[in-house]
């Protein structure tokens, strides 16, 4: 539990350090609606990267279940391993697509 809290503190301090300072120009752009687009861009990127986090979680579950299956039936290890690697590669493709979409949202939109 403490490692999760440490990770959250590191992330929040990194976000706070990289946020632009509030100035009169930033407040005026918020009033003009440009700030809402700016905010929406980063919220959309965060939502997109939730897919990458979910992929990481599911890859962990997949690997754990494959290890349990091999422990129960060591003779089936080659088939289980090959099936697991194909499944992990397909899942990793989703995470890569999410990363590409996030980069496009940040730099193109």
Curated annotation (Swiss-Prot):
TM helices/strands, residue ranges: 42-62, 88-108
Record site: Reversibly protonated during proton transport: 92
Membrane topology type: Multi-pass membrane protein
InterPro entries assigned to the protein according to its UniProt record, in alphabetical order: ATP_synth_F0_csu, ATP_synth_F0_csu_DDCD_BS, ATP_synth_F0_csu_sf, ATPase_proteolipid_c-like_dom, F/V-ATP_Csub_sf
Superkingdom: Bacteria
Molecular function as annotated in GO: lipid binding; proton-transporting ATP synthase activity, rotational mechanism
Keyword entries, A-Z: ATP synthesis, Cell membrane, CF(0), Hydrogen ion transport, Ion transport, Lipid-binding, Membrane, Transmembrane, Transmembrane helix, Transport
HAMAP family found in the cross-reference section: ATP_synth_c_bact
Xref: PANTHER family: ATP SYNTHASE LIPID-BINDING PROTEIN, MITOCHONDRIAL, ATPASE PROTEIN 9
Entry's family note: Belongs to the ATPase C chain family.
Name of the protein in its database record: ATP synthase subunit c
Species in which this protein is naturally found: Ureaplasma urealyticum serovar 10 (strain ATCC 33699 / Western)
Gene giving rise to this polypeptide: atpE
